[in-house]
Structure formats: C-alpha cells, structure tokens
UniProtKB/Swiss-Prot annotation:
Alphabetized HAMAP family for the sequence: Asp_carb_tr
Gene responsible for this protein: pyrB
Enzyme Commission (EC) number: 2.1.3.2
Enzyme class: transferase
Annotated function: Catalyzes the condensation of carbamoyl phosphate and aspartate to form carbamoyl aspartate and inorganic phosphate, the committed step in the de novo pyrimidine nucleotide biosynthesis pathway.
Residue numbers binding carbamoyl phosphate: 54-55, 104, 134, 137, 271-272
Highest taxon above the source species: Bacteria
Protein's name in the database: Aspartate carbamoyltransferase catalytic subunit
Pathway given in the UniProt record: Pyrimidine metabolism; UMP biosynthesis via de novo pathway; (S)-dihydroorotate from bicarbonate: step 2/3
Organism: Clavibacter michiganensis subsp. michiganensis (strain NCPPB 382)
An example molecular function term from Gene Ontology annotations: amino acid binding
GO annotations of cellular component type: cytosol
Pfam families: OTCace, OTCace_N
Length: 318
C-alpha cells in the first residue's frame, strides 16, 4: 500500500487485511510497554490545515507506539498563514526527509494532489479532506462493528449481512462518504437517513439506500449499528432545517428512539458530539454506545495503516 486516500480504492481483501493488522496492533496496546519498534527511524508528519483534536492526537499516538519520530504541523502560525503554497510546504517536508505525511485539509482532493504531484516522495494518508473522505475513520468504525459482532473471532471476517443506519448531516460529512463505500465493500447494508436538504446531489450512485424518515428506517429490520453524524454548522451558509429543536425531534437519537432499538444494536458517533441535538446524553452514555471504543480503536487502526504504508511488510512485528 503506497497511499491511503479513499475507501473506494480498497478491495474487500485489502480492507479485511488492514482490520486484521489492527487486531495485532490492539494486542500491542494490552502490553505493559505499549510500543513496538516497527517504524524506528521513520519520520511521520501530521500536516493539519484544519483544527483537529481526536484525529491528530490519534495519529500521533499511533506513530509513537510504532517508535516513529513525529512532527506535528499546524497551518496556524506557520508559513502557510503567510501565503506558502501546498507545493512549497510539501517540498520543505521532502527536504526534511519525511517518510509518511498525514494530511487534513479543508479542500476536497488535497491529499490526492499531494500524492500524485511528485512534490514529495512519502506515503500520504488522508485524515479528512473537505467534505470528500475520511478513510481511517471509516476503518475504525468497521473495526468497532466487527469486534462487537465477532469479538475475538473477528480476524478474517467482513461485515456480511450487517445492517448499518447512518443518520444526520450527510451533505457535509466525509465520514458518511467513506463509510458508505467501505462498509458496503465489506458486505454491510447501509441506509442513510437525513433531511432532504442534507442529502448530497449524486447520492443515487452510492451503494446505499436513502431514507428521510428516521423512525421508519429504524423500524425496518432492526439495525446492528446506528451511527449519528454531527451537524456541521461551521460548513453551513444557509438554513438547512428550521431550528435545532425541530431537527432533534425528527432526526435525533433521543431517549425514546434509543429504547426502541434492538437489544444488541450499537450506537456510534465519530465525534465531536452535539449532545441534545443529534444524540441525547442518555444515548451517548449508554452501554450500547461505542464512542469511547471508537477512540481507542482509532489508535490501533491508524497504527495498522502507518505500519502497512511505511514498512512494506504485511505482518506486524509482534
């Protein structure tokens, strides 16, 4: 694997292999010393042009557990804020000897540009580009679902027949896009639920079912997982729904809807959460919730991605 830019690029076998290596990395996390020398001598740069807490820290933890050297770059306070181009930034990192670059950028397609430009000879990981994709989030979501379904027998398995309902601001969600492609590649059945104003143009070409009524979607064959998406108000330049209270009433996972879910249905959220809007506090904190598991699993999955990207080996050094 040279780069990880989109979940659409992954075959089923490739996706399952990443999840299996992530299982090995999760085992590393159970040791007294939670490190492996797999990437000793390698340099990973976290190149973030957008604010991030969970993703940046998760990638940093992943790289350090693999014994890589980590450089954190933030656009704020850097030469980028003075007008430096992506090309010049990439060439600077090339001169510094970066082996892997984790990129988050507000412009859709920026990681693809970086990977195909020839400006830098490094493995590129897309950590979120505009409203396009966020592949490692989808991988950690798939990893979480697979572990909940299969436990210690998860290795080698996909998500065949698993029903996943993704609810909320699909229009602005790179998480929804990456999950739509990855989960279906792994065999899951995905339903998107959103207000008509928050459904993107062209969704008919996605391998998903689209619904506008959350209650009907939840009632049609109990889902195995319900994933709530954050309302991304910072990306909205118009009124996409009447008001927050109305949104929560029609499309939020409130206490009443939580009580109607099947006994084994899990509740997911990529974070950060707007409690009381897309998800109630009771749902977020319930035993069904995998929010904290997703954070922990994110480190294991990102360890797997960095390992496969930078080591050139398919077997983790355990």
């Amino acid at each position: 694997m040279r780069h990880l830019l989109s979940t659409r690029d992954l075959s089923r076998d490739e996706a399952v292999h990443i999840l299996d290596v992530a299982e090995d990395m999760a085992d590393v996390g159970t040791r007294e010393i939670k490190k492996t020398p797999a990437l000793r001598g390698r340099t990973v740069v976290n190149l973030f042009f957008e604010d991030s807490t969970r993703t940046r820290i998760s990638f940093e933890a992943a790289a350090k557990r693999l014994s890589a050297d980590v450089i954190n770059f933030s656009a704020k306070g850097s030469s980028v804020s003075k007008g430096e181009s992506l090309k010049d930034t990439a060439q600077t990192l090339q001169a510094m000897g970066a082996d892997g670059v984790v990129v988050r950028h507000p412009s859709s397609g920026a990681p693809h540009t970086l990977a195909g430009s020839g400006w830098i000879d490094a493995g590129i990981v897309n950590a979120g580009d505009g409203t396009h994709e966020h592949p490692t989030q989808a991988l950690l979501d798939a990893f979480t679902i697979r572990r909940r379904l299969h436990g210690t027998a998860a290795r080698g398995k996909g998500l065949d027949g698993t029903r996943v309902v993704i609810v909320g601001d699909v229009l602005h969600s790179r998480v929804a896009r990456s999950n739509a492609w990855l989960l279906t590649t792994l065999g899951a059945e995905v339903t998107l639920v959103a207000p008509p104003t928050l459904v993107p143009v062209g969704v008919g070409s996605w391998p998903v079912t689209v619904r506008y009524d959350l209650d009907a979607a939840l009632a049609e064959g109990k889902p195995d997982a319900v994933m709530m998406l954050r309302i991304q108000a910072e990306r909205m330049r118009a009124a996409f729904f009447p008001n927050p209270c109305e949104y929560a009433r029609i499309w939020g996972l409130d206490d009443a809807r939580l009580a109607l879910l099947g006994p084994d249905t899990i509740v997911m959220h990529p974070g950060p959460m707007n409690r009381g809007l897309e998800i109630s506090a009771a749902a977020a904190d319930s035993e069904r919730s995998t929010v904290r598991e997703q954070v922990a699993n994110g480190v294991s999955v990102r360890m797997a991605v960095l390992y496969l990207l930078l080591s050139g080996d398919g077997k983790a050094d355990r």
